Design a protein with these regions (language model features):
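Short secondary-structure boundary/hinge segments and terminal tails
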Residues: 4-5, 70, 92-93, 122
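A recurrent flexible, glycine/aromatic-enriched loop bordering the glycosyltransferase active site
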Residues: 26-50, 62-63, 69, 111, ...
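A short, conserved alpha-helix in the catalytic core of glycosyltransferases
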Residues: 45-47, 51-56, 61-88
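Short, flexible helix/strand-to-coil boundary loops that buttress conserved ligand/catalytic motifs
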Residues: 56, 93, 104
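Active-site donor/metal-binding and catalytic loop motifs
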Residues: 77-101, 110-115
Length: 197
């Protein structure tokens, strides 16, 4: 659930990504759900410890999305992921467009370093379009003055993600500047492949 002080963009994001229907996701859902099969949030998650440890736990050096990484590993290994809509916690962010750019830059870096996730589960292109369409509809009904901010934020996310996907073409100081998680870059060295698998 969004925090009580969440702005309209944060409210919509929570409602869009965390629905009211309980789901059990498995390999069989990849065709229909794509990358949403492995979408989850560590802000309110539990893992079966034996499986978590058997699959190697979280990666040692990832910029973010360790929850998606682990979910993808579990689905690949034949396990299922449960989303329990009845359980609830308040978690949201009133990010500025700059902060959204930084977060999506880091998301792009994550996928550039872990291309196997999009290769095996698909990209987020269609889901991104569906999100933007839903957001505009939500704002038209509830907070129309936020539409310009939403459009700016969408552009910031798109640009950040695209730059993050090509982080190896950028100077390291630029990557650190663009990133929300700046300490990640302290131990990065360029190589022909940064895939973590």
């Amino acid at each position: 659930l969004p925090h009580h002080d969440a702005n309209p963009l944060a409210i919509h994001a929570r409602n869009f990504n965390y629905g009211t229907e309980t789901l059990i996701k498995s390999k069989n859902d990849i065709k229909n759900l794509g990358i949403k099969t492995v979408f989850m949030s560590n802000s309110f998650a539990a893992y079966r410890r034996s499986v978590f440890e058997a699959l190697g736990g979280f990666p040692e050096h990832t910029i973010l999305a360790e929850d998606m990484f682990m979910a993808a590993r579990m689905i690949q290994a034949g396990y299922k992921i449960a989303y329990c809509a009845e359980a609830s916690v308040r978690h949201s962010h009133n990010y500025t467009p700059k902060q959204e750019f930084q977060r999506y830059f880091d998301t792009g870096v994550f996928h550039a370093c872990n291309p196997w996730i999009q290769r095996d589960f698909g990209g987020a292109g269609g889901e991104g379009f569906r999100f933007v369409k839903s957001e505009i509809q939500f704002l038209l009904k509830n907070a129309p003055f936020w539409i310009p901010r939403a459009l700016l934020t969408t552009f910031a996310k798109f640009l950040g993600y695209k730059l993050g996907k090509h982080w190896q073409s950028l100077p390291l100081p630029t990557c650190r500047y663009f990133s929300m998680y700046k300490s990640y870059w302290n131990n990065i060295q360029y190589s022909s492949s940064k895939e973590i698998k």
